[in-house]
A protein has these predicted regions:
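Patatin-like phospholipase
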Residues: 1-36, 44-429
């Protein structure tokens, strides 16, 4: 059976919605959904059949939606625009938190009452489960539970308890106190596994936290995690939320469909095709590098494969399992970031190269890039005698100045070729 587990992480839960949107668009169906903290809320919305409602709720989220906080204060805080009035406001709010013995969760509860429908959850054919931690004052006791074992009328309470961070005002369920389930299992794959699920997807939002992986060897699971940090969990900035929803959407496509890249989304070519491009790289472009290193009597292609590429991989801190194409794309991404190339788009390898070639240098990095354009195979010194930044940047601009034109095939050239092919194809336009 196929199930999905959503990791807890407060505002970072927006990432779940992007991943789920991409999964549902491609026909994925799940027999069960579980989660911890905000993951439990999002899982409940899936189970009750209200994904679109949940998606739009997140898309329109504002800081004041969940907490009694001034929106302008949050904007100034995010912009690091801190003045005396902000400090006074923060001091006043801190006193309220202390007086109330925690952050007021009235608005959080209102969200649950507005969106969660216990009857729909219980009537759904999908399994729903969550993790909470009971705390009796002496020791925490983890509670992993499915909907059929939650007392009637208490599903909202259990979801609320699953998200009960210690900084929140504590609430009890029938005299028992609970804290955030993330203190035990923040992404409850094993909860699904305990019910017979053997095909699992884990949607992470805090990938640095240890994941409790499935126990059974025959259980399949895919881990989808952010390509970049999602920000602070308790900051509900609408811009950040929307960006994380987009990131989730494209990270899912990258993971399931095997796209390449770390910060971009690139539909690569086969390793054999890329190897052919490297082999076709002109010897006359390699020879200046050989001369700068005092390499005599060595085949230019050996210089490329035995010197340039390994040193580039080391400078970029690429693992030993990195392919030649992986190294090439890592260089591309470094250049693309400097030029502020749009991230949330799926590029073919050649589209990505063409986009970089056509783009203008961003003002903030133009001077750096201009200096780098002067570097052409400046690798005469051994790598350990060159600072990592200098070495990496010199590679970047040699790569941008020369290798992009020879290893990459421009989209415009491809389009021209395809048009000619179309005209020659039995007369069809």
């Amino acid at each position: 059976m196929k199930g999905i587990a959503l990791e807890g992480g407060s505002s970072k839960g927006a990432y779940h919605l992007g991943v789920l949107k991409a999964l549902f668009e491609r026909g994925y169906k799940f027999k069960g959904a579980v989660g911890t903290s905000i993951g439990a809320f999002n899982a409940a919305m899936i189970v009750q059949g209200n994904f679109d409602v949940c998606y739009n709720m997140w898309k329109n989220m504002q800081p004041e939606t969940l907490f009694n906080v001034d929106n302008q204060f949050m904007e100034n805080l995010l912009d690091k625009n801190i003045d005396r009035s902000m400090l006074e406001y923060a001091s006043t709010e801190a006193k309220k938190v202390i007086a109330n013995k925690g952050i007021d969760t009235t608005k959080l509860r209102r969200i649950l009452d507005t969106y969660i429908d216990e009857d729909k959850i219980r009537a759904s054919k999908m399994d729903f489960g969550l993790v909470i931690v009971e705390f009796d004052g002496l020791k925490p006791v983890p509670v992993e539970i499915f909907k059929e074992d939650i007392p009637k009328g208490k599903i909202k309470d259990y979801i609320m308890a699953s998200a009960n961070l210690p900084v929140f005002k504590s609430e009890d369920i029938d005299g028992k106190f609970f804290i955030d389930g993330g203190f035990y299992d923040n992404c409850p794959l094993r909860l699904l596994e305990s019910k017979g699920y053997d095909d699992l997807i884990a949607v992470r939002v805090s990938p640095n936290r240890k994941l409790r992986e499935p126990i059974k060897e025959d259980t399949k699971f895919i881990e989808i995690k952010p390509s970049e940090p999602l920000g602070r969990g308790l900051i509900f900035s609408n811009d950040t939320i929307r960006r994380n929803m987009l990131r989730g959407y494209f990270d899912r496509i990258k993971k399931i469909e095997g796209l390449k890249g770390n910060k971009y989304y690139i539909d690569g070519i086969t390793d054999d095709e890329f190897m052919n491009r490297l082999i076709s790289y002109p010897d006359e472009k390699i020879l200046p590098y050989a001369e700068s290193r005092g390499v005599v009597g060595k085949n230019p292609k050996r210089i490329l494969f035995e010197d340039l590429i390994p040193e580039t991989a080391e400078a970029l801190k690429m693992g030993k399992d990195a392919t030649y194409q992986d190294i090439f794309i890592e260089l591309l991404e470094s250049i693309a970031e400097g030029k502020k190339i749009k991230k949330f788009k799926v590029y073919s390898l050649d589209e990505f190269i063409d986009c970089i070639n056509k783009s203008e240098d961003d003002d903030s990095s133009s001077s750096r890039l201009s200096e780098l354009k002067k570097a052409a195979f400046r690798l005469a010194k051994p790598i350990e005698k060159i600072t990592p930044i200098t070495f990496k940047e010199s590679i970047l601009k040699e790569f941008e100045e020369s290798m992009l034109d020879d290893i990459g095939y421009h989209v415009s050239q491809l389009e021209s070729y395809e048009k000619n092919e179309d005209k020659d194809d039995d007369g069809w336009d």
